[in-house]
Amino acid sequence: MSKEIVSTPNAPAAIGPYSQAVKAGGFLYLSGQIPLDPQTMTVVPGCVACQTEQALKNMKAVLESQGLTTDDVVKTTLFIKDMNDFAKVNEVYAKYFAKDAPARSCVEVARLPKDVLVEVEAVALCK
């Protein structure tokens, strides 16, 4: 089985020794997306809803670079700084996964890169 490294300028560049995504075995494995503006590489300021929106936009950009959509996502993992924000995160998340939502885990963590409030990781089925 071979693997293909995926990179797009429409999503933030990796801030460490990892790829934006890797395609292997018929799946696209997306690294965690945080709310960075892809052009400036700065954290999008504001509330958890604003940061969730940007993280999901970044995820969508990586998917679209491979001809995929959120409909192709089979699993997501959300990392949030405060579980009290769960409802706010869900409200934004539901706009991206309105029907046939993927399997999902949501974990509260002590700290995320660049002290953001949310990170989104995904696995998508390639066409």
Walk through the language-model features, giving the residues of each.
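Short, polar/acidic, helix-capping and beta-turn segments at strand->helix junctions
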Residues: 2-127
